[in-house]
Amino acid sequence: MSHAVKIYDTCIGCTQCVRACPTDVLEMVPWDGCKAGQIASAPRTEDCVGCKRCEAACPTDFLSVRVYLGSETTRSMGLAY
């Protein structure tokens, strides 16, 4: 079952989510839009096992990284009723 991993612009570039991911789905990429000069990216979502460790590791008040599991993916993106 595929999962979607969404990185929001509230990412502070702390790398906590990247270090928490057991399957290396996430990586940091350069980005001028935050103080750290980098932001999380999810180039390998096909490897996501849905453990949500990245969400648990995120220190921001609004989770900067969210994992949407299976059918939750289409619902959250407005593709299903």
Curated annotation (Swiss-Prot):
Protein name stated in the entry: Photosystem I iron-sulfur center
Cofactor names: [4Fe-4S] cluster
Entry EC no(s): 1.97.1.12
Domain of life: Eukaryota
Subcellular location: Plastid, Chloroplast thylakoid membrane
Keyword Cytoplasm: no
Residues annotated for [4Fe-4S] cluster 2 binding in this entry: 21, 48, 51, 54
Subunit structure: The eukaryotic PSI reaction center is composed of at least 11 subunits.
Purpose of the protein: Apoprotein for the two 4Fe-4S centers FA and FB of photosystem I (PSI); essential for photochemical activity. FB is the terminal electron acceptor of PSI, donating electrons to ferredoxin. The C-terminus interacts with PsaA/B/D and helps assemble the protein into the PSI complex. Required for binding of PsaD and PsaE to PSI. PSI is a plastocyanin/cytochrome c6-ferredoxin oxidoreductase, converting photonic excitation into a charge separation, which transfers an electron from the donor P700 chlorophyll pair to the spectroscopically characterized acceptors A0, A1, FX, FA and FB in turn.
